[in-house]
Amino acid sequence: MRVGKMSLTLLISLLSWQCMIESRAVGNDGYGLWLSCSFPDQSLLSEYQDKITSVVVIGNSRTCEIIRDELNAGLTSLLGKIEIMPESRLNECDLIIGPASAVTNLNELISPELPVDLGPEGFMISSLRIGERESILISANTEIGCLYGSFHFLRLLQVGQSLTQIHLVSRPRIQYRLLNHWDNLNGRVERGYAGRSLWKWEELPDSIDSRYRDYARANASIGINGTVLNNVNADPRILRADYLRKVAALADAFRPYGIRVFLSVNFSSPISAEFEVNRNRHGGIGTLSESDPLNPEVRKWWKEKAVEIYKLIPDFGGFLVKANSEGMPGPLDYGRSHADGANMLAEALAPYGGVVMWRSFVYNADVDPDRAKRAYLDFVPLDGRFAKNVFVQSKNGPVDFQPREPVAPIFGGMPYTPLMLELQITQEYLGHSTHLVYLGSMWKEYLEFDTFARGEGSTLASVIDGTLHHSPMTGIAGVTNIGDNRNWTGHFFAQANWYAFGRLAWDHALSAEQIAGEWIRQSLGQDPVMVEKVTSMMMGSWEACVNYMTPLGLHHIMQEGFHYGPQPSLERAPRKDWTSVYYHRADSLGLGFDRSSNGSDAVGQYFSPLSEQFDSLRICPEKYLLWFHHVPWDYTMKSGRTLWQSLCDHYYSGTDYVNGMIETWAELKNKIDPEVYQHVSEKLKQQQKDASIWRDTCLNYFQEFSRMKIVNVQTE
């Protein structure tokens, strides 16, 4: 019976593979992401073909079937021919995949010694000898670990890894590695630039779109193990019984790939709709008249809801909460604290192993005149008061996903509370899905940022991976850039940011350059000239974007609402801290927000010696200069040029870089798939126009205050 089932699986895999080959013949539309396995490393192809001719996957679970399918399709594409063998022929196989216990049970001569700290998701890829035969073993403590190892093995064949005497061990540095979807139930995606939501709520639970499994497959290939399905501005209906059945159907589809589902919840969900005017923002689905977290009836409602959820989804991950922020309800409405609200939900989830991710994105103007200080002031005094299954989830910077910010001082400031880092994969402030901006470089700058919370070496990475404060649980979240566009992300190169997030979430020690190289070789090909030039393009693209948008620490000077183009002149908005002039503070004397000890004293929220460094105009890193200081126009920079001249230089440098990317891409025309080439060319042309608009708009506006000539160092 098992042989017959395997044959059917092979037939389905071969048919699927034939369809993939045929679709590739008409061009790369981006749907296959980095998983097409179309580009083996030619320098090692002969070695690969000699060493890998047969495969056995031990086990018959759905996860094992997926491993079998992935290796069959991937190795056939890369090597030309592969034989999938039954477990009974394990001794004859070149590649063996299975949990250590299962491998040992089948062949007592093979007793994989896995590292004791491999955990439930780590894996080992190792050469071994069975009699006279040299084989390779992919093993783990669990089938999910074997799945991760199998995807990594396919990656190795495309990035030039020799298989001779290979011994590789990999384990995730962070426990919860999540995507956050800002998807609304009506199909719209907040800050989404790649079409509508993937989730077809109107068809669920009866119809499971094949794209859901492709989504899970892509995430599993880079180690993402959880997804928050809906917007943090949560519609209470997501907790209704009919929607929970839909969520359960998605959870069933994702589970074999090691992916758990989470939900954003509205704090007012227990309230009856009749008690609120704006149902989607404040009203609920319950029968109560309030959602005070200390009210026993409110606590009971959440406990009963948790029982309902876990009956449908036994491995449900937990709740993400946006509370008392931008109009969303929360515990402060009842005179309670953020800890009171989070702990109520944590109590409901704790019996089932669920977690609460309570966002620190709050900026009540009554807390402090400086928006950048508010989250710290609200949350740091609560350190140690959150339940053990609560994360405080903080954005990387203290304002809002700007092109560049210093790290939020809350990181390092709450040693007794697990902190989850929230990054934004979607490019809300970095050109949407039009601009080529590789975010791996940005995220590495943040992860390597030294908070000095416990002296030198207290990096952001060490805070979120638990090593600095010995946190009992660790997490990282990425606000996704995925939609129902054929290529998933709107821009072909935006796929690299999804990929980079997953790889860094698994191992933040990887370099941005290594990750870019992996993605290029799997997505575009192996040509060494192409790989080198595209890597160079990607590695400088984020700094270029900062330069043509918000250089030297400028921030939040974009279009109101849409956040795409420049609007430094914006001075009227529903809130003062939604205007541009609030942040740049340009006047006849200079430019920048004074957050020094003589200004708002935001520098005081950082540990020494950072606080002193940021406080000093002379030694403050110039990339943060206008974030922390109001600087005279004629101030002499490290280059010897004035602030005004340096501002001009940065804006022109940014646009020059985009011009260079266009030239480089044109040189690669014959080395890139025609469909990809045309798609990216069109995006780059628009990026060139946009970058010039940013430069000219901002310099012309700031010139009104500096009264100095716009200069370009390259033409002076």
What are these regions (language model features)?
Residues 7-18:
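Bacterial N-terminal signal peptides
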Residues 21-133, 163-165:
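Acidic, contiguous N-terminal accessory segments
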Residues 203, 278, 286-517, 523-527:
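Catalytic-core regions of glycoside hydrolase
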Residues 48-49, 88-89, 129-132, 171-173, ...:
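Extracellular/periplasmic catalytic domains that process cell-envelope and extracellular macromolecules
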Residues 56-61, 96-102, 139-141, 183, ...:
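Structural motif
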Residues 458-716:
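Catalytic domains of carbohydrate-active enzymes that cleave complex glycans
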Residues 60-70, 74, 111-318, 350, ...:
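Feature activates predominantly on carbohydrate-active enzymes
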Residues 1-5:
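Positively charged n-region of N-terminal signal peptides that target proteins for export
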